[in-house]
Amino acid sequence: MTNVRIDQNGIPKAPVLDPTAPLLHRSGVTAVDAGDPADAGGAVDCAGYERCRFDISITGAGFTSLTVQILFWNSRQSLWFGGASRQFTSTGQHTLDVDARGATIFLKVTAATATTFSLAADYALS
């Protein structure tokens, strides 16, 4: 069965691409995240959408690599669970496509090898 979006009345929408405009998720990130966020306040709510595309911009000096991980929020336990991670080995613009399936997600910086770096990430849902 094809995955379809459900409207606010519980009625299936036609299986068409209905992407959102890009919105800011994180900006000015200049250090590895010390831990998971305390709550889901700064996360991306993907309710009603299957995928989330992160458009990631990385700048830096002495840059070798930067690793990000997708976190998934478990609302019953009020905890984050780690998903897949990806390592970038160059600065510039990168895209990361996440199979979110309606979850609440967060892009966490887990490692960096650079003298300095800055990360910004927009997201678009579809």
Per-range role (PLM):
Residues 57, 71-73, 110, 124:
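A generic structural motif
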Residues 79-98:
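An anionic, turn-rich surface loop/hairpin at beta-sheet edges
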Residues 115-126:
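Exposed low-complexity, polar/acidic, P/S/T/G-rich flexible segments that act as propeptides
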